[in-house]
Amino acid sequence: MVDFELVRTASRPRCPTQEGGVVIRSQSPVMAGINDDAAVWNKKWKEEVRLGIIPYYMFIARDTGAQAYFNVPLVRAQKLYSEAIRSTSGLCRTARGPSMSCTPGKVEVVGVQEVQGTEAFVLRFLQCRDDEWIGKVFFAKFDPKAIWCARRVLTCCGAFPALS
């Protein structure tokens, strides 16, 4: 787990960079056995705000390399995010997540919902190669074991390339 004492020792309330007007934002991957605990994320975001750092993203580690050792299923990552953000102040709620950088753009896992009698992931584009899709909500086939972009899109606003 994250050693917040080490972070606190290495940090000052405001570093010289911040005093010069630089804005610092944080992003971190959610990783099994390291920070896959809502209390860790909650504490992390609160500590960052105390240090003048803006929480930015909780992201899903890419589907490469050692991902098999550290992966967290999308449905669990979304529950961790929701639970962690629920008891923070508005200053911490700038953190988005969980998100993934896929071929068409950055996708946020919003939740799970029944769509036409089928369970589906509710996803939203945070960034996208096609500006028209930014902020659009769409659905993808639900798989409780999914650790990366769902491959089969059920519905979206207009034509949409397959996630990969």
Q: Language-model features: where?
A:
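Conserved AdoMet/S-adenosylmethionine-binding subsite of the radical SAM
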Residues: 1-88
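Auxiliary Fe-S-binding modules of radical SAM enzymes
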Residues: 49-164
